[in-house]
C-alpha cells in the first residue's frame, strides 16, 4: 500500500513541478486563441476550464486506463512504476505539446500540424495512420462498452434485444455520429463532463473500497520486484504496450485538438492537457492496484487475476472488481 501511495504522490508532485517546467518551456502567452478569434459556434466555442478538463479527460481516457491497467497488473506492482514515470515524463509531455501545437495552429488536427512542419508526404502518412488508428480505437471503444452494458443487463434480469451486443453497438454508433456532426457544446460539452465526473468517482470508490476492507492488500513493489505474469510474458516490452493509455498513448494527439479549439487562454493548457493526462495516470494506478489487491497471488504469480481475465475478459473483470 505504501508503494501505491508513493506513486500517487509522485504523480501529483509531477503535475505541479515537471508539468510546470513543460508549460514554461512551451511559453504560453496572452495571444488570442482559436476559440476567441474564430468562434464559429460549431467546433470553435469557448468553454469553461473545468469543462475543458473533464471533456479532455474522457476523450483520452474512457476504458483505456481501466482495461489496460487491469491487464498490466498481471505483471504485478512493477506496473506502478511504468504508470507513474510514463505519465509524468512521457504521456503528460506528449499530451501537452500535441494540444498546444494544435492550439497554435488554429486547432488543426495532428495530421495537419505534422504537414505544416514536416511537409506533405509526412502529412499524408499521418492522415492514413490516424484513420487506421481511429478505426481501431473506435472499434474497441464501441465493442467494449456494448459488451459491458450487455453484461449489466443480463445480470439485472433483462432479456431480449436489450441483451444483444448488436443493439447497443447501433445505439453507440448513432450517438457517435450525432455528437460528431453538431456543435461541440450541444452534446459533448454537456454530457462528457458528467461522464468524466463519473469516471473519477468510480476510481475513488474503488480505492476507497480497497483501503477500508482489511481483506484486500496492495502488494509492495520492493517485495515483488519481479515478473509476476502467470505465463512468464516479458515485462519489456509487453507490459509497456499493454498499459499504453495509462502512461502514454499517441491516440491522445487525435483528441487534443477538440479542446484546443475551445480554450479561452493558452495558460489553461497546463491544467487541461497535462492535468488530464496525470488524472488518467492516477485512474490507471488505482485500477492496477485493484487488479493486484483483489485477486489471489499463487507462488508469486498473479494467477487469480489471470483467471478472471480469461473467464470474462476485461469487461467482466471490471464487473468483478466493482462488485468486490
Where do the model's predicted regions map?
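Helix-loop-helix module between adjacent transmembrane segments
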Residues: 15, 90-106, 110-181, 244-248
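Conserved small/polar residues in nucleotide/adenosyl-binding loops
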Residues: 320-324
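Selective recognition of specific alpha-helical transmembrane segments in multi-pass small-molecule
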Residues: 7-17, 130, 134-138, 196-214, ...
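Hydrophobic, membrane-embedded alpha-helices of multi-pass small-molecule transporters
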Residues: 48-64, 209-215, 225-290
Amino acid at each position: 500500500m505504501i508503494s501505491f501511495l508513493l506513486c500517487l504522490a509522485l504523480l501529483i508532485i509531477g503535475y505541479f513541478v515537471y508539468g510546470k517546467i513543460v508549460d514554461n518551456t512551451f511559453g504560453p502567452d496572452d495571444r488570442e486563441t482559436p476559440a476567441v478569434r474564430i468562434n464559429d459556434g460549431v467546433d470553435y466555442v469557448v468553454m469553461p476550464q473545468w469543462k475543458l478538463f473533464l471533456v479532455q479527460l474522457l476523450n483520452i481516457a474512457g476504458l483505456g486506463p481501466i482495461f489496460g491497467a487491469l491487464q498490466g497488473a498481471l505483471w504485478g506492482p512493477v506496473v506502478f512504476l511504468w504508470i507513474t514515470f510514463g505519465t509524468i515524463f512521457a504521456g503528460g509531455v506528449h499530451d501537452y505539446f500535441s494540444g498546444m501545437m494544435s492550439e497554435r495552429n488554429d486547432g488543426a488536427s495532428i495530421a495537419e500540424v505534422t504537414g505544416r512542419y514536416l511537409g506533405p508526404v509526412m502529412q499524408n502518412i499521418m492522415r492514413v495512420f490516424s484513420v487506421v488508428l481511429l478505426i481501431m480505437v473506435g472499434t474497441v471503444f464501441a465493442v467494449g462498452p456494448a459488451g459491458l452494458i450487455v453484461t449489466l443487463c443480463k445480470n439485472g434480469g433483462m432479456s431480449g434485444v436489450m441483451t444483444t451486443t448488436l443493439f447497443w453497438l447501433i445505439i453507440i454508433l448513432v450517438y457517435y455520429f450525432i455528437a460528431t456532426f453538431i456543435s461541440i457544446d450541444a452534446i459533448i460539452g454537456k454530457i462528457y463532463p458528467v461522464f468524466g465526473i463519473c469516471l473519477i468517482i468510480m476510481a475513488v470508490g474503488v480505492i476507497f473500497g480497497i483501503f477500508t476492507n482489511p481483506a484486500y492488500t496492495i502488494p509492495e513493489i520492493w517485495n515483488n520486484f519481479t515478473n509476476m505474469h502467470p505465463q512468464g510474458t516479458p515485462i519489456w516490452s509487453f507490459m509497456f504496450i499493454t498499459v499504453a493509455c495509462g502512461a502514454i498513448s499517441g491516440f491522445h494527439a487525435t483528441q487534443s485538438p477538440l479542446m484546443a479549439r475551445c480554450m479561452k487562454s493558452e495558460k489553461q493548457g497546463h491544467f487541461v492537457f497535462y492535468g488530464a493526462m496525470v488524472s488518467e495516470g492516477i485512474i490507471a494506478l488505482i485500477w492496477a492496484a485493484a487488479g493486484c489487491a483483489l485477486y489471489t497471488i499463487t507462488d508469486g504469480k498473479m494467477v487469480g487475476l489471470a483467471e478472471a481475465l480469461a473467464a470474462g475478459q476485461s469487461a467482466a473483470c471490471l464487473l468483478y472488481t466493482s462488485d468486490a
